[in-house]
Amino acid sequence: MQAIAKNDIKTGTVVDLTHEGHGVVKIDRFPIFIPQALINEQIEYKIIKVKKNFAIGKLLNINTRSENRVAPPCIYYERCGGCQLQHLSYEAQLEMKKEQVINLFQRKAHFDNSKINDTVGMTDPWRYRNKSQIPVGKNEQNEVIMGFYRQRSHDIIDMESCLIQDSQHQEVMNEVKSILKDLNVSIYQEQLKKGLMRHLVVRTGYHTDEMMIIFVTNGKKWPQKNAVVEKILDAFPNVTSIKQNINDSHSNVIMGRQSITLYGKDTIIDQLTDSTFKISDQSFYQINSEQTEKLYNKAIEYAQLTGNEVVLDTYCGIGTIGLYMAPHAKHVYGVEVVPSAIEDAQQNATINQCNNTTFVCGKAEEVILQWKVQGIKPDVVMVDPPRKGCDETFIQTLLTLEPKRIVYISCNPATQQRDALLLAEKYQLEEVTPVDMFPQTTHVETVALFNLK
């Protein structure tokens, strides 16, 4: 193999893309990963890091450009870590995400008879985020800055806009930056673990336009809070809720457990088709409302509900998918380990007049067995776990329960694939549909259908 050393300048042809969106050039089968390089491009690159099994390169020149390359519209793209794929056409992004899923389920796990559908994309893949979490800091001139983190760092890029956030959010961000400066509000400095204002969080109802503004502070005492609220209301008189969240931990967790309502309601309302949901500052609620409706409609299609089925909604959160399915089912049982989420789910069931739902707080694998003793046997199980996937004990419980169908939504196809291999003992993976919940990024969500063999 050719010698490869740091600072070498080399040329080559990109033969693949990684799941992180990096181009792959190979020298005698040795892979070099190069951010922002695209398949079939002939490039010049510099080696910046060499490891035992791979190297990292920096793109210097593109000698032959891919037909899928586009100009990134964001002026912060080269520095910001929020997006990874703005230089790739949207059609090619959707194809790349499908290839990721094919690679995981067919090439690696050998689910050769399982259908992988095309990625479900957006008509307009911008301005889709209904929740923004914006760090606050100071620059070297001691000026207030707000924006998002530089790639692979906690250095804040001072920004005036973000093209994947709701446009209202950037208006709020810019106004808040001015207010914090004018009122001389103390700003949290992560390295020193000192200061007050840590993050600004903004949530909007996609269909209702209700808006919640949350100030995350390092402690409860905030002398200027009344003045800040007054200025916010002057600038945004239609705001639904203003809250203070207290996070005095020294971790990377954005929000703490305690919140105080400074103005308006404790929650905002949003809708998904015919269902209405109450959302608090802490609620898990899908970031992309337009794509969530497509994702849930595909889940209902997979569930094949006729109105006679008992559905078990595990990892149910605030009840979104369970309540979405309730009009099509005989009864929906939801289970979630977070008490506040179950309270929200129960309230959302009342709001939607869903009398055929039951929501219980607890570990799914334990509650399922309790229900089994009570004679409750689901026909369909909905699974929507966090990124780490399902606990193995939960998978084993499902295998003993033997529902006719399992519909598995995942925000991490790698752990979904791992769980699919465990379910394969009794279940046939029929098909997987990727859904693009986060355009311009490498993230892909999937919904999969498993039928009992």
Where are these predicted regions, by residue range?
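Short, acidic/hydrophobic/Gly-rich beta-strand patch recurrent on exposed beta strands
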Residues: 23-28, 147-150, 214-216, 345
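Hydrophobic beta-strand signal
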Residues: 44-46, 133, 312
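Extended interfacial segments that mediate partner engagement and assembly in macromolecular machines
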Residues: 60-72, 79-187, 207, 222
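Short, solvent-exposed loop/turn elements at beta->coil junctions and helix N-caps
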Residues: 117-125, 190-191, 199, 203, ...
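Short, aliphatic-rich beta-strand segments
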Residues: 202, 209-218, 276-280, 380
